[in-house]
Curated annotation (Swiss-Prot):
<dbReference type="GO" id="GO:0005737">
    <property type="term" value="C:cytoplasm"/>
</dbReference>
<dbReference type="GO" id="GO:0042450">
    <property type="term" value="P:arginine biosynthetic process via ornithine"/>
</dbReference>
<keyword id="KW-0055">Arginine biosynthesis</keyword>
<dbReference type="InterPro" id="IPR036393">
    <property type="entry name" value="AceGlu_kinase-like_sf"/>
</dbReference>
<dbReference type="GO" id="GO:0006526">
    <property type="term" value="P:L-arginine biosynthetic process"/>
</dbReference>
<feature type="site" description="Transition state stabilizer">
    <location>
        <position position="37"/>
    </location>
</feature>
<dbReference type="GO" id="GO:0005524">
    <property type="term" value="F:ATP binding"/>
</dbReference>
<dbReference type="InterPro" id="IPR041727">
    <property type="entry name" value="NAGK-C"/>
</dbReference>
<feature type="binding site">
    <location>
        <begin position="72"/>
        <end position="73"/>
    </location>
    <ligand>
        <name>substrate</name>
    </ligand>
</feature>
<dbReference type="GO" id="GO:0003991">
    <property type="term" value="F:acetylglutamate kinase activity"/>
</dbReference>
<comment type="similarity">
    <text>Belongs to the acetylglutamate kinase family. ArgB subfamily.</text>
</comment>
<keyword id="KW-0963">Cytoplasm</keyword>
<dbReference type="InterPro" id="IPR004662">
    <property type="entry name" value="AcgluKinase_fam"/>
</dbReference>
<keyword id="KW-0418">Kinase</keyword>
<keyword id="KW-0547">Nucleotide-binding</keyword>
<dbReference type="InterPro" id="IPR037528">
    <property type="entry name" value="ArgB"/>
</dbReference>
<comment type="pathway">
    <text>Amino-acid biosynthesis; L-arginine biosynthesis; N(2)-acetyl-L-ornithine from L-glutamate: step 2/4.</text>
</comment>
Amino acid sequence: MSEPIDLSQISPSLKAEILAEALPYIRRYHGKTVVIKYGGNAMTEERLKQGFARDVILLKLVGINPVIVHGGGPQIDQALKKIGKQGTFIQGMRVTDEETMEVVEWVLGGEVQQDIVTLINHFGGHAVGLTGKDGGLIHARKLMMPDRDNPGEYVDIGQVGEVEAINPAVVRALQDDAFIPVISPIGFGEDGLSYNINADLVAGKLATVLNAEKLVMMTNIPGVMDKEGNLLTDLSAREIDALFEDGTISGGMLPKISSALDAAKSGVKSVHIVDGRIEHSVLLEILTEQPFGTMIRSH
């Protein structure tokens, strides 16, 4: 596990250098939207949670518009365990029956989201929580999961959705009024059902629709790793396809990297996978020139 950066040990002169280094990036991203997929340890360790809240407040203060899409897998697992249910995953997607969907809505749209909003507001920011059902934000359709063992057939994984369309009006309205949107990845379908959507997929689609300058996806590893455990700092579409094919990218990383690549192909100028276990990883990625995590390229 990466050692956290101990900011208390940084000298005043080095802090001044860091601030000076950030100025060109503040100018570059001023007035631009940055979508952040927030998840993993950064959502469960108190030190990292507080650091993240301060980071997004600082981004807003210097004129950058952060939009947060959060996950909550561990919290959902804990809630399911309390009612005697075991989480099941297929190709990185949670199988979601009706009872599980009720838990997902309660945990993501309630407990997890409000924790994030409360912490940002506590430190002086102005955050507003939304689900994809608010303001018609995320229109969803049922996800048909291809059966890898039976080509041409599909596996029913319940109320799991994919993004059919995004109406960004409510997000733009919040940005115009200087709020920080915090979005739970729950969509609504024409059938009247709620759908559990992978947060990585929502973040990628939202970044595209908002014409975001950058998409940052936080995870619990340094970035995309090869089979020997080495960090891959820069990946093209062709290289990613090869990593899918040989199984290097698997499980929960499948939707994350697929979404990141789709966003890059759709015009999001900068897409990065970063280690959320490192304190202030979002600021390090956005406001410094230090190579950090894995950059995803469309070509």
